[in-house]
Amino acid sequence: MGVRKRETADARKEANKSIAFAKLNNCPTSPRKMRLVADLVRGQKVDRALNILRFSSKEASRKLEKLVLSVIANWQAKNPEANMEEAGLFIKTITVDGGMMLKRLRPAPQGRAHRIRKRSNHVTIVLGSINNTQAIN
């Protein structure tokens, strides 16, 4: 690795140390269904997002609720002296990407078979702080 590339990589690594984020990999739900729930909480304050997820009837909301609680715990671990209410935490970014696909065969007429794709997804949540000048993910 070149010197400039190493310096930018080190700078990026230092910037990520102050960011609180959480990832959920290979969640066995289709990305399309997970995005419906993720769009509900994108940009919301953390307590409001938890209420939305808690009272949603979608199955994906249960998994996202646990992920939001995890990212809050990560933020508290990185900022032990800060108060969560005073920081004004909100969901800065939430991304849902496609994950691994399990390919299965379903019998079809006349001896053929159709391929079934069982999809999974990866979810990443980054927190932001309203009252802090430094961006916290």
Swiss-Prot record:
InterPro entries membership: Ribosomal_uL22 (IPR001063), Ribosomal_uL22_bac/chlpt-type (IPR005727), Ribosomal_uL22_bac/org-type (IPR047867), Ribosomal_uL22_sf (IPR036394)
Listed Gene3D superfamilies: Ribosomal protein L22/L17
Keyword Chaperone: no
Molecular functions per Gene Ontology: rRNA binding; structural constituent of ribosome
One matching Pfam family: Ribosomal_L22
GO biological process: translation
Keywords on record: Ribonucleoprotein, Ribosomal protein, RNA-binding, rRNA-binding
Top-rank lineage group of the source organism: Bacteria
GO cellular component: cytosolic large ribosomal subunit
Subunit architecture: Part of the 50S ribosomal subunit.
Cited function: This protein binds specifically to 23S rRNA; its binding is stimulated by other ribosomal proteins, e.g. L4, L17, and L20. It is important during the early stages of 50S assembly. It makes multiple contacts with different domains of the 23S rRNA in the assembled 50S subunit and ribosome.
Family, similarity comment: Belongs to the universal ribosomal protein uL22 family.
Protein's name according to its UniProt entry: Large ribosomal subunit protein uL22
Organism whose genome encodes this protein: Flavobacterium psychrophilum (strain ATCC 49511 / DSM 21280 / CIP 103535 / JIP02/86)
